[in-house]
């Protein structure tokens, strides 16, 4: 977004996020640069990806549910541009953190995704704390 490109906004949000996270004993945080900038030492970092075609189909269903008339090709084009903008922007570009687990959601439905995420979290807890 236009606001996310502003350096002073990113800095203020970074400070707020870091302070919020420090006050929490256990926290799940989502965001573009959480794993690479805000919480580089997090116990578990996930980086989600999905094919453009599948993202566009999902987004189109959202638009259709809102009775918006838009074509799949238009949605694909917008998503391709958004991904390009996100990965190439100068301030906090979208990158996969070094030790983040890549999660490709292209072929997963919501239930499968939920199971996968729960298993990743359980495994991370087991590695850090053993069997609880």
Segment roles from a protein language model:
Residues 1-26, 53, 73-90, 101, ...:
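ATP-dependent small-molecule kinase phosphotransfer cores
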Residues 29-37, 76, 92-100:
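Glycine/charge-rich, flexible interdomain linkers and switch-proximal surface loops
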Residues 67-71:
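Short helix-capping segments at alpha-helix termini
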